């Protein structure tokens, strides 16, 4: 049975008819300040190491590149991504014959920006809502404790602020806390949450959610799912079943599969990402808890590893601290405020 945590007929903002990115709804200046603050520890750690690596050196040589490789790996950029960046810089050094250490920061900046662009990251991120996709269905995956429910709540807030009618689905039926937390977020944001009894079939919850959303004329549906990795086959089967059942209501659902990762866990986030990519087709990433950590390099490495764009980053506890990921702004905050 479909149960709404709050009144599904609650008033919502008028639905806007144009397809918009959420970056337009926020003050860019405020976003930039939040981003700068969130990446401050990453920047300080990274550039402190970089300054020491080139101390007393006038040109980029093998020793400098070896030091840079170590810096990137210890900054949680990831081994594969680090190798790619070093190879690109080596090619430039070989081509230009002489590259001064004073140029290294700009070269590194350009290569990181290029890598992010190649993985589909752009300057106007976040989810856009095509007019012919209604409701737009987002299935959210990720292990427990990464900020999945919080991300869903903040994402629902942003959609609602943009004038969209949102319905949430509590398909993580294995943890009572997960359903309770989602209902709390639904009440806080002012959007309905569809749930069933604990232990119910998650696919059944997803079916009810989409049916309810269609009946209400909702613009967006966000489905929470269980965050279990101890049984990869079971996870894969469960997510596949949810997708198949949703397609009985919305034939091309889900339109996005958003993987939420905890950026502060560094290398653990890479392993989680690998497991979920094996279990389902991830189309977008949200990297949370970047504020207060020096592990911001994980954003670069995971996007490059998976060849999946980062759509959102979490930079704090406030509703607006879930920011649409903007490649240029991210690189600017990491390296300074010059043009990327």
Enumerate the language-model features and the residues they cover.
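P-loop/Walker A NTP-binding module and the surrounding RecA-like catalytic core of P-loop NTPases
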Residues: 110-113, 119-340
């Amino acid at each position: 049975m479909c149960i709404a945590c709050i009144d599904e007929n609650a008033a919502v903002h008028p639905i806007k008819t144009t397809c918009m990115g959420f970056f337009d709804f926020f003050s860019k200046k405020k976003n930039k300040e939040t981003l700068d603050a969130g990446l401050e520890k990453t920047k300080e750690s990274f550039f402190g190491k970089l300054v020491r690596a080139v101390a007393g050196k006038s040109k980029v040589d093998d020793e400098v590149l070896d030091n840079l490789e170590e810096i990137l790996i210890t900054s949680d950029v990831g081994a594969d991504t680090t190798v790619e960046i070093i190879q690109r810089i080596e090619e430039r050094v070989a081509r230009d014959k002489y590259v001064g250490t004073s140029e290294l920061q700009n070269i590194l900046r350009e290569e990181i920006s290029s890598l992010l662009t190649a993985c589909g990251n752009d300057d106007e991120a976040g989810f856009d809502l095509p007019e012919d996709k209604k409701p737009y269905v987002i299935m959210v995956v990720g292990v427990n404790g990464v900020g999945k429910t919080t991300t869903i709540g903040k994402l629902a807030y942003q959609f609602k602020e943009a004038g969209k009618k949102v319905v949430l689905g509590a398909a993580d039926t294995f943890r009572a806390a997960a359903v309770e937390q989602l209902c709390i977020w639904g009440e806080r944001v002012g959007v309905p949450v569809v749930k069933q009894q604990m232990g119910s079939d998650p696919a059944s919850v997803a079916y009810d959610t989409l049916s309810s959303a269609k009946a209400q004329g909702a613009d967006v549906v966000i489905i929470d799912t269980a965050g279990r990795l101890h049984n990869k086959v079971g996870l894969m089967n469960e997510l596949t079943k949810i997708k198949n059942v949703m397609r009985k209501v919305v034939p091309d659902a889900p339109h996005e599969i958003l993987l939420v990762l905890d950026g502060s866990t560094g290398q653990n986030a890479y392993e989680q990402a690998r497991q979920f990519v094996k279990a389902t087709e991830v189309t977008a990433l949200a990297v949370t808890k970047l504020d207060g950590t020096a592990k911001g390099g994980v954003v670069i490495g995971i996007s490059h590893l998976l060849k999946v764009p980062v759509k959102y980053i979490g930079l704090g506890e406030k509703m607006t601290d879930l920011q649409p990921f903007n490649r240029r702004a991210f690189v600017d905050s990491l390296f300074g405020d010059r043009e990327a």
